[in-house]
Amino acid sequence: MAETSIFPIMMLTVMIGVGRGVTDSPGRVSRCGERPAANTSVSYGLLSRIVGGTSAVKGESPWMVSLKRDGKHFCGGTIISDKYVLTAAHCVLEKNFEFQVSVSIGDHDFAVYERSEQRFAIKSVFKHPNFKPSRPFNYDLAILELVESITFDKDIQPACLPSPDDVFPTGTLCMALGWGRLQENGRLPSSLQKVVLPLIEYRRCLSIMETVDRRLAFETVVCAGFPEGGKDACQGDSGGPFLCQRSQGRWVLVGVTSWGLGCARKWADNILDPVESKGSPGVFTDIQRLLNWLSENLNQDKPDFPTYQVQCSTNDGIEKGTTGEILLPTGYKKYYSNNEKCIWTIIVPRGKHILLTFKSFNVECDYSCDLDYLVIYSALGRLIGKFCGDVSPRPLLIADASITLKFISDFHEYKTGFSLFYEAVEPDTYPDSDCGSVAVIFEEGEIQTMNHPHLYSSHANCQWVVHSPANYIIKITFLVFEVEPSEGCIFDRLVVYHDLQGTVVAGFFCGFALPDPVLSVSNVMQITFTSDYSANYLGFRAVISFVLPSSPVKPEKGNNQPRKNQDAMQHFDEGCGVSPLPPRFLYHNLIKAEEAMPNSWPWHVSINFGNKHVCNGAILSKTFVVTSANCVADREEFPSIGLIVAGLHDLESSINTQKRPVEYVIVHPDYNRLSKDYDVALIHVQRPFQYNSYVQPICLPDGHSRLEPSKLCVVSGWDLNVELSTKLQQLEVPVLMDDVCKKYYDGITDRMFCAGVIAEEDNASCLAQSGAPLVCQSAPGTYAIFGIVSRGVGCNETPKAGVYSSVFLFIPWIMETILSVAGIIDTDSEPHHPLFPPDKPSQQKALLPDSPPSSSSQDIYVTCKDVLSLQSPGEIKLVASGQDGPEGGRCQLIFQAPEGHFILLTFKQLSHEHYSLIIYEGASSNKTFKAQLMEEKIPTIMKSAGAVITLEASSTAQDSALHLWLSYSFHNQN
């Protein structure tokens, strides 16, 4: 089939109230864009590919379609309703297509029969009339109408079509799916593949395409991909879906796989490459641009479908005056139209506020109001509320003289619309609210934070006043609760009052624990929600009900604060690279950083000089921090003014932090101030860090870890965006190929690499977030530090990717430097984390570069009975018990390196009962005592003074037990 590729769009939504009586449309068991059979979480941390991708998990793409000719797959498609499938127009060109092709759904692996598989015949084909085979990259879209209706279940669901308001920013990670070739002209897979690609800015895509052929004109496309290639859709993926995820979790069909130059070719150097080597981003048909055509063809079989096809079926525009009414639809029309977009602006006299009262309301219901909805904005564009369902929203008092209402409908399911009155009222009718509204509630129902299920806004100051009938009290029951946690709820919080004056507190709440229900003491309750300028979360959703008091209610103050404020902190074992509070990405955008979950990067530290945040670093051990040399090179002679702050999220708050004075600074001896080569340094602190839920070390990469191009990693820091943020930010960045990096930067050495998106807007590390760690997943949930920010580009210039020092290449220097402090690393009273990530034994070598794994490396499993001489680097596991002999066990491990070398022992595991473990320098009669190993005080690494070292284990007890696992490597003394 034709070549391929990918691209897209997104939006921010809100809901103050969703109507009751949610019912599915006929034949719909679930809602579009949901995956009931799959884990709802999506990890982009370990990047996937179709060309360069991974196998999809069964159930995570229930809308996927395979078009088959003679039983063989040739194109993909997407289920969008119980009767319709979307595919590419270039897939349906053959004569009598509907009689030659079948639609297969519920299929995941072509090699095996699956109970979810279903085949459908095609009734009719609607190809976009503007599609031309001679110019197949425009209007490349077709609708397949099925003979029979699809019955939805957990394995088969439709994808959502985009709404006119959906916007997915440049850099957003989206997903393409298909059974296409795994490489250009390569084999076809049997199981469904997926690839995650970032959206490319439209103008940039056009400029790239001009390097292919200036005659190409792209009108209805979106583009996605990495400049260095390696990941794309390919032959056989055509017609398949390209989906982006809304912030509350739904998957939206943003594009249909259409076209591309080759498969996964790089296009960063297209101008320089010969014609036969040029590549392109993935090119997808832009569904949002073709919504009107889709609506006309998807609804023509509905007898009651409104035939008027205008942007808004009623007179929208500006409404002025002290009172008025807004109706949709109007006149003889019974239903509003599909694909409507109506906008009203209400303006009342200056100094007045606006009271909205809904007379009727019936809009297609959806839990997140993403299908059809009415949305209200303040004069400054702040989102006030988003509504859908069949229950009228409660009266809204907006503290402004101007508001904007927008109504959006999708391509199916039309209802009878709404009727509302607006009225200008005096400002003192109820207290003002910076939230933009005061909800006055006289009926039972639901309330929720602004923007829910999206993040609530900063500087919110929202208010609900609830009145119950006489003789009833008010009960608030929380369904969802996620508000920025803090000691005493000093940042963001929900407060419930027993009175309108706000003097009698019924409860205050923040964090992630679901509060207990709150009862009022009378028929009045006031609820307020406030937020500061950052760290926004999902907020809350709660049910208001009126109940009869069973007994006199005493005002009690409630809260949801757990002991020691560790409600979201998981139990964790001491180690490295694991956060007690796992990181969370809401937007999966490769260009614009977002605020991190507090303390989700617990190794990140602020390096202060003169009581001011200067740069960043990462904790390697309880006494060592790694950073960039350019951060500290001019300050290494003045360590006394340095301070390391760990456990820090907000630069303006010291909650949960540990402050450690700098003892000394060690800059790499080969650091060059001009070229920034060897840009790495270590800081030794005067007192050890205490590991807890907020402070943890990061792992070093192990000996088998390599950074592949396009691998997604994470950089964290306080100034990743244009303006300095006081809250820690995070940004996902893809690793770039060396030749791409060298194209944009001069002086790139073997000790540097680049990561980030080259785009026409702000980018990674643009303010030279010096010393910030770049961490990558070494295993699910475990991170290692692969890079240290060395330099970036000012945001006012054309953005480039950030330049990072390669930590892997500095491991020998890091270890040598730390070991030079003492023969044994950090042996204070607590056990220490390994400096390398936990993994399978075969991946635990973590050897220094001058002692690479080889055919002579040993992986040995022994019992404690004899003397074992080890003369090649490797690993050993020693297991013994008192049952090995009547007098316990005794053994020696003699590690012997070549002359002129020293030995590094890396301890990975030690547990013993009634065993003595002693390390000696030398062997036999020439050995001298070096250290005794204690289970509660195990070192991470031990360095020998000479070329021979002996480990002796002995026990005389029959109930003794020993488990020891270590690796050993040999290194030149010079």
UniProtKB/Swiss-Prot annotation:
Residue positions of the active site: 90 (charge relay system), 140 (charge relay system), 238 (charge relay system)
- Disulphides: 75-91, 174-244, 205-223, 234-263, 312-342, 369-388, 435-462, 489-510, 615-631, 713-776, 741-754, 766-795
The glycosylation sites annotated in the UniProt record are 39, 763, 926
Could you tell me which Gene3D superfamilies the record lists for this protein?
Spermadhesin, CUB domain, Trypsin-like serine proteases
> What is the induction comment?
By human chorionic gonadotropin (HCG).
Which molecular function terms from Gene Ontology are attached?
metal ion binding; serine-type endopeptidase activity
Q: Where does it live in the cell?
A: Secreted
Output this protein's name: Ovochymase-2
Q: Could you tell me which species this protein originates from?
A: Bufo japonicus
